[in-house]
């Protein structure tokens, strides 16, 4: 009788395969933050699509659970209210609802991490830490003007600017804060002194990067996270049986003066003491110019909320609302497509009742979880990361970007896991395939419509001629196509009616000077003198310098009020 052969793979082969899977999944969490792809009319599209592809791959590689029913209800309510606010305009509410669906899928992954224990939860910590450390290095190279050799894998901004591949200093700072939470958790759950020394070094690098960002949002995150961590560390040391140990409170609190010392030194090293590089200390002293300040922005948004308090202006309508409004006081001078405060943004676009339902639902979830009683180290990490994103959302809009949607969903699932994972485990492959299909189609369509924004010699061969006609029928990026069509069309007596109608639609997508000029010129040719004068008045109020430039160029037309 022959010898029986085992069907079980030897441990020596299983272990490398398991490690390879862990490395792959860690990379999938980190990659959205590191994606260097930027092309076409909307710079964050590729980052969002890469985030969806990584999310789909994570769904396929598991583990997948299911968040609590309250989470499903909260996300579903948000999607429903957004869709109802822009009923019929798929290009407006569709992307927002897809983003909410992506967050929902990420919550299933977060719940799966809980079910697989601490080892699986380290996926989130390691992925965010890798992204944070790589971005910190890129940011410091950018800060000192040394990133040029790495283009196109990163950007090379002006001296003294650091933002990695996120292209915005507050997003960069929030990533550093997420990585700071990861370092603290990994330190607390590790017994190896060598590992702890490595994590301490990583923490110093993150601290330097945070100072280089000159982000006031990042400073608030650092102060709050470090302060809470020091309090937890003190509580740990009051009991002699604590299993997990953060660094001593005195060392944690030392990072705060160290941060300010680094913030003082960095610009002097970059600018040679000439003052050419703005420091964090200067930003805290001077703040933003009055007509660019958040306080003025929020006053304008509150005025808009008061005009439509119950139903809002509609999803995606803030930019048009701000342009068309006449304020009694000062006016925020830029195109305002976000309120830079999530509750206020929901109120101005969806209405106060919808904002109360969405924000109140989230607050109910938080209060029911009682974070102030939390002792589990994995959940403490989740609370820290969630806090960094929530704080940022009170000052800007990180949840409009794929990497932060992914981490936000993972944290929600980790903190509010459901009881049963079986239904979602079965649905995960289908959700992953759907995400890949949507991302693939959107990527193809975006490449196609982006051709009109390129010089003829840089376009794909099949789009070199008659480009606009070939890309006109886009289902996802219809606004970008119509914007290109409008700006490329000369207004004549023959096409004035069509241009006027198109300009009116595009005003709700991007109410910028070149669109306003087309609207005024077409109204003039159609004999709508009063409409042209009213629009010119709005133009002068919203963009005075652009209006003056246009008047100098068209002094003989006589349509100014």
PLM region spans:
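Alpha-helical transmembrane segments of multi-pass inner-membrane proteins
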Residues: 25-38, 44-61, 79-86, 95-109, ...
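Flexible juxtamembrane loops connecting transmembrane helices in multi-pass membrane enzymes
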Residues: 162, 225, 262-298, 378, ...
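Transmembrane alpha-helices of multi-pass inner-membrane enzymes
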Residues: 182, 221-229, 378-429
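A membrane-periplasm/extracellular boundary helix in multi-pass inner-membrane enzymes
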Residues: 212-213, 218, 233-286, 429-430, ...
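TM-adjacent membrane-interface loops and short helices in multi-pass inner/ER membrane proteins
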Residues: 168, 295-336, 343, 350-356
